[in-house]
């Protein structure tokens, strides 16, 4: 008998400007330590694009426009469960950057990324986003 895996949809967004900066979050919870890209889960009855806009607003205070889906990353998570990470990028945004209960949000130079303690797979995720053929 085949087992069907439960799938949890999540998103992350590489928010960048034209001066070489990216937006990162240092999460409060220790389940994924290190800096990461902002994002979160897709909720019931919302599209994947609605979810990334909502999550970015909740975590960073910014309203993003025209996020581009660049890649999908899969993480097996125990028996019969997997996460699908929907990886976006966006350079159209408005509002003031503010941290949330999720963690401290701040801008860094993209070229300085490896000076920070990175969360698991962050290098790979950013590479997937930056190398996407859109």
What is the role of each PLM region?
Residues 89, 98-129:
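NUDIX/MutT-family hydrolases
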Residues 63-71:
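A short coil-to-beta-strand element that immediately follows conserved catalytic motifs
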Residues 8, 37, 64, 81-85:
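Short connector loops at helix/strand junctions that flank enzyme active sites
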Residues 73-96, 129:
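Active-site-adjacent beta-strand/loop module that shapes the phosphate/pyrophosphate-binding cleft
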Residues 11-13, 69, 88-90:
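A structural signal for short, well-ordered beta-strand segments
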Residues 15-16, 24, 90-92, 107:
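Conserved hydrophobic "DFG−1" position in protein kinase catalytic cores
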